[in-house]
């Protein structure tokens, strides 16, 4: 029977084979016509690579079927090294929710009078709601950078 082999250049060659012929036998016939050694040949039929020991009938290759010839690529890709991190990743800060935390900013005396424990900045550029930071010997405004001494 006659089969066609489409080569690397796009040229189609015809081979006279039998259905009992092995793929090795077909590759040697291609070598006789094209000069490509069998160990560099890969034959593809219906999207599958043909293995050397099998016959044409194993792959259901019939008369006037077309095989595709491609070259075998030697070697593989270079193995990449895995990244090794020297420092451990920083753990994200978890917000601790404290129930009724706002009560720590106010004081209620025996008569029921509510007073603020934190002082507001008296500078007119800051406005209401800007509190002073308590330090050991002073009060500090983070907005206008004013410092107030505390008499202790």
From Swiss-Prot:
InterPro entries noted in UniProt: Ribosomal_eS31 (IPR002906), Ribosomal_eS31_euk-type_sf (IPR038582), Ribosomal_zn-bd (IPR011332), Ubiquitin-like_dom (IPR000626), Ubiquitin-like_domsf (IPR029071), Ubiquitin_CS (IPR019954), Ubiquitin_dom (IPR019956), Ubiquitin_ubiquitin-like (IPR050158)
Superkingdom of the source species: Eukaryota
Any GO MF annotation of the entry: zinc ion binding
SMART domains: Ribosomal_S27 (SM01402), UBQ (SM00213)
Covalent cross-link Glycyl lysine isopeptide (Lys-Gly) (interchain with G-Cter in ubiquitin), where: 6, 11, 27, 29, 33, 48, 63, 107, 113
PROSITE patterns assigned: UBIQUITIN_1 (PS00299), UBIQUITIN_2 (PS50053)
Domain Ubiquitin-like span(s) in chain numbering: 1-76
One record GO biological process: modification-dependent protein catabolic process
Residue numbers carrying Phosphoserine: 122
Record keyword Mitochondrion present: no
GO CC term (a single one): cytosolic small ribosomal subunit
A Pfam family: Ribosomal_S27
PANTHER family, alphabetized: UBIQUITIN
Family: In the N-terminal section; belongs to the ubiquitin family.
Note: Ubiquitin is encoded by several different genes. UBI1 and UBI2 genes code for a single copy of ubiquitin fused to the ribosomal proteins eL40A and eL40B, respectively. UBI3 is a polyprotein with one copy of ubiquitin fused to ribosomal protein eS31. UBI4 is a polyprotein containing 5 exact head to tail repeats of ubiquitin.
Protein name: Ubiquitin-ribosomal protein eS31 fusion protein
